[in-house]
Amino acid sequence: MEAMMNFTSQYTVEEALAIEKEFSRLKEKCYLDHAGTTLYADSQIRSVCEGLAQNLYCNPHTSRTTEDLLDQVRYRVLRHFNTRSSEYSLIFTSGTTASLKLLAESYEFAPEGAFVYLKDSHTSVLGMREIVGTERIYPVEREQLLKELDSSERSDSEHSSLIVFPAQCNFNGVKYPLELVRKIQRNGISGYGKERFRVCLDAASFVSTSFLDLSKYQPDFVCLSFYKIFGYPTGLGALLVHHTAADQLRKKYYGGGTVKIAMAGRNFHVKRDPLVERFEDGTLAFTSIIALLQGFETLERLVPSTAGLRTIERISQQTFHLGRYCYNRLKALRHSNGNAVVKLYHDTGFEDQGLQGGIVNFNILHEDGTYVGFAEVSYMASLHNILLRTGCFCNPGACQRHLQLSDEDVLKQFDAGHVCGDANDLIDGQPTGSVRVSFGYMTRKEDIDCLLEMVEKCYIRKTIANGFTRTQIVSKYKSYDQPRLKMICLFPIKSCGAFKVTTRWPLSRRGLKHDREFVIVDENGVALTQKKLTEMCLIRPQINLKTNEMTLSHPSMDDFVLDLDLLGESQRIKLCQTKVCQDNVQAIDCGDQVAEWISVALQTSGLRLLKQSDEEVRTFQQSKQEIALANQAQFLLINQASVRWLADKVPDWDELHEEPTLESLVDRFRGNLIVETPTSMEECDWKRVTIGYLEFAVDGPCSRCQMICIDQGTGVKTTEPLRTIGREFKGKMRFGIYLSHVNPLRDGSEQWLYCNSVVEGLSE
């Protein structure tokens, strides 16, 4: 057992150093989502670019040279799987999903043929049910499939049925014995009489780090994606068809290059004879296909074959040992009361490389055994520069089985608002998904240690705190008998520092005047936030309403004054588009001078400052009120009393070098309206709010992310208070409430919010 708790690299020291040099762009990030996509090497991309720059690659329908090169790539791919073109035809597709769809559309079932699929399959396999040419569609459980290894009943029917199962489950990396292929082809499936089955192997997850030997195991169809193996190119995959199964496919649609003749005036055509030429519609992604050669070359150079072991077999060894190290280390973690910190979702204990790939799936448990939501874990991982995957990973069957959810449970979660890919991670205390980490040939032991350190730091409570708790924070502040508006905060530039107002501020049709009116974008036009650049909080805008100027300050820069009058719609301006919270937004470029100032301040070249166009109309579906560049509401209300209560719940501020103040904690929540009430959390019951003479509707609670773990005064990341919010609210990462103005004036007249106004919250 002690040996399994340690990790021994399968690479030489020289190999490990050469690999690490190829991925220096990771810097301090720990990438642990190789089941999602592995990473491409620096030299791989340079080689691809050099090839494109030095060669003339024409359309393969134009140039025989390009066509011959594509054939060489086909041979190289088949050789990787230890087979040749006399055994398998390789049809290029856009990926595994497209391969499965093509098979489902083309497979010719006999009148009584059945389509059978493993329940623990990818969503793309489940989607085949909608278009296969048979009504006999059946799922098979994992246990039932494995029983076919012992089957001896031979199939002699002419019925042509089809079964699809993965070589490796993308949920937790369990491998299915490839002996099943031959067994099912010969004996059929128990419970289906004498029906003859052809086998489709979903190999996408398996071939990323394991050797698929098609000379030993010969499924009728194999589906895969190349980015899982090489990281680049994306949007390219293959359907491998065994020559004995080629006649089972009947193509319906035909595109360019797939016919001998096609007539425009008559509905007549004749398809080409070779299978590949019939099925590859239009012009192939030929430059991407050619790039596969650099992928193979890079793998074999960085992880060279040794006596008796191919490159991919060595990679399989390395990733298995990484997975076993991670699995056993997580399994050994304990809370102070002896309870497990992690619940693992596995079908093996990482004893056998032939039965387990380099994927570890788990959820984290609190000390009392309750679940930590996967969204919270994802936020914490992001704070620690760890990239991992959460959810159900497009494998609802495996997810449901391991989380022990009935069909009724899944439907109940859906009715409660949970959908695939959202952050609704706990419903009634039960998880809707989990956390997955996965490993590639370039993964280091240090990457896993970073994950383990994060889990221990964030979820194993220490017995001694450093003393920065409520006693010190509360003593400096008094409570108020009547709720009042203490401060107005606006954020002129999205994700930058706050402009704090303690007197009064005007409203616009979008919320606070000038609030989140500007956004910083990178050289690709992508909006930046503190999730990517925490230093953005150090840029602090100030608005002068009299002069209509915005002054930008930064600790290391001279102030920059931007004349807002020069950004009017009537001026000669540069309009552009960016995307904010999934919305396309029309904006005005604020010019080169401020762009240069921001780029220097944030030490990032190519940044631009954009202002939302006055003509832009952006709304959020729940309130229907116009909003600026805020995430989803006109206003965010934060209660100081609730922040104080939350601070009392934080067990340890060990990442801070000095005692936190209430003001600094309030700043983390980036609220617009800072109120003080006699009791904490009473805002959670409000449905409507009156502040002075203005009325607001409550749009709902604010879901929090890792942004609240950034100290707005320094840009330093901490694990609190997000960790405590997740624990105190049973995984619901909510704090603060969204408001929208009920009766905004649209005739140009101004309405004002006044600090120290009485706040009245109505619960009905």
Swiss-Prot record:
GO biological process, alphabetically ordered: Mo-molybdopterin cofactor biosynthetic process; molybdopterin cofactor metabolic process
Pfam family membership, one: MOSC_N
Active site: C394
Positions of the MOSC domain: 607-762
Catalysed reaction, written as an equation: Mo-molybdopterin + L-cysteine + AH2 = thio-Mo-molybdopterin + L-alanine + A + H2O
Reported cofactor(s): pyridoxal 5'-phosphate
GO molecular function, one term: molybdenum ion binding
Signal peptide: none
UniProt key word Transferase: yes
Sequence positions bearing N6-(pyridoxal phosphate)lysine: K228
UniProt EC number: 2.8.1.9
Keywords assigned: Molybdenum cofactor biosynthesis, Pyridoxal phosphate, Transferase
Physiological role: Sulfurates the molybdenum cofactor. Sulfation of molybdenum is essential for xanthine dehydrogenase (XDH) and aldehyde oxidase (ADO) enzymes in which molybdenum cofactor is liganded by 1 oxygen and 1 sulfur atom in active form.
Family: Belongs to the class-V pyridoxal-phosphate-dependent aminotransferase family. MOCOS subfamily.
Protein name (Swiss-Prot/TrEMBL): Molybdenum cofactor sulfurase 3
Organism for this UniProt entry: Aedes aegypti (Yellowfever mosquito)
